[in-house]
């Protein structure tokens, strides 16, 4: 029941399973996923000491090979002497530091210090490597014990265990040839032929040593040697060496492909002719739930212009989260993505919206020249920009034309089983993508420029427009200030005028009131009936007229 539910969940929610990346909408603008892998990070390395014994044990054929051995020693000296000088130059200037406490009882080792004045010029990488070199070096007693053990061994690979120390692996690349071919043939071959055979073998071995340690001649302190290169000096049997080193992790192939196993020179002996290496082989830690997706894009046409969507080549998903992924410190293998450090960093919200299906959030740029893919095979279907390249149905011989309203053409077996595109013949499968992606149904993102010259030109134009906008804003501010001052002045004038009008109006009203008051008094005196004139001796007619 649980298995059935899980199957239904995968079928019904494909985008949820793939980390919320909407592959359906992305395919409409020419972006498809070409693979997914787990994410693993290298953790703290384990260290193992390896000794390359450059001088084989030739006790059984010593009488026939003296000349060849002397010439071989001379050649080895030209390689080992510069490395020895460089190692001594930095190791002799590294001294231990004691604790600063005065108590003898509490005095202890506190670390190491580099005598910079005596050393002179050294880079930060050389100083760091020099400190690590000092910490991995064997003491004099251990070196002498190692010399004695190497002189007595005649095995190609020998495990040497010293008292109180870890196992040391000693390797001699020519010893098997001497033991298995030259020594048994001593009775059938003359002494000269044995010497010549050994001389040729030693010369070839010297060439391998020179190619291996040649780059270390310039900077033997910080130079690292990969285990692949080291295998040539170990006789070519890398599996046996790794087995002897005790490494049997399931991620061995991934670590080898990512070149995670490194070796550094810690000691060179130019008398006994051997080199001591410190080999670091890391373990891997898988970050659960993180999936790395690889993306590829196909260009598409809008009219006569060819565009492609600008998305990163790799992205990482963890549940609903989508992050950018820096593939610089990483290697890709069938076992997953192996990184020497954390390669995830945040993604902008706009780009996250693009991956979640909002095509209007996906920026696009013009195709310059012949840059960009014009077709890609995904889920057995051919996604092609048939407006820019010739698409032909190989089965029928007809040309597959692209509708001007379409930005891409999706070809499956129902349309043409065998397709010839840009001179390549491809057999396609059943339809997985609908061939109905029209321009008017897609919201395309904003156009941007990725070319350095175009970006610089656009930035210059933007700065110029900003300066002009600033000047216009300053002018508008000045106009606003002028209008503000003028409005204040006009308001004052209006208020003064209104005050004067009000005063004049009050005066006029006052004068009118006084005049009316005087007129009313005069009329009262004339019309008062209590005052009668003296009419004595006046005729009746006159009185009547009055």
UniProtKB/Swiss-Prot annotation:
Domain of life where this protein originates: Viruses
Residue intervals on the Cytoplasmic side: 513-546
Extent of the signal sequence: 1-19
The keyword Glycoprotein is annotated on this UniProt entry: yes
Keywords: Cleavage on pair of basic residues, Coiled coil, Disulfide bond, Fusion of virus membrane with host cell membrane, Fusion of virus membrane with host membrane, Glycoprotein, Host cell membrane, Host membrane, Membrane, Signal, Transmembrane, Transmembrane helix, Viral envelope protein, Viral penetration into host cytoplasm, Virion, Virus entry into host cell
Site features described as Cleavage, chain residue numbers: 108-109
Cystines in this chain: 330-339, 354-362, 386-391, 393-416
Membrane topology qualifier: Single-pass type I membrane protein; Single-pass membrane protein
Cross-referenced Gene3D superfamilies: 1.10.287.2480, 6.10.10.110, Head and neck region of the ectodomain of NDV fusion glycoprotein, Newcastle disease virus like domain
Record text on subunit structure and interactions: Homotrimer of disulfide-linked F1-F2.
Family indicated by similarity: Belongs to the paramyxoviruses fusion glycoprotein family.
Job description of the protein: Class I viral fusion protein. Under the current model, the protein has at least 3 conformational states: pre-fusion native state, pre-hairpin intermediate state, and post-fusion hairpin state. During viral and plasma cell membrane fusion, the heptad repeat (HR) regions assume a trimer-of-hairpins structure, positioning the fusion peptide in close proximity to the C-terminal region of the ectodomain. The formation of this structure appears to drive apposition and subsequent fusion of viral and plasma cell membranes.
Protein name, as recorded: Fusion glycoprotein F0
Annotated organism of origin: Rinderpest virus (strain RBOK) (RDV)
Gene: F
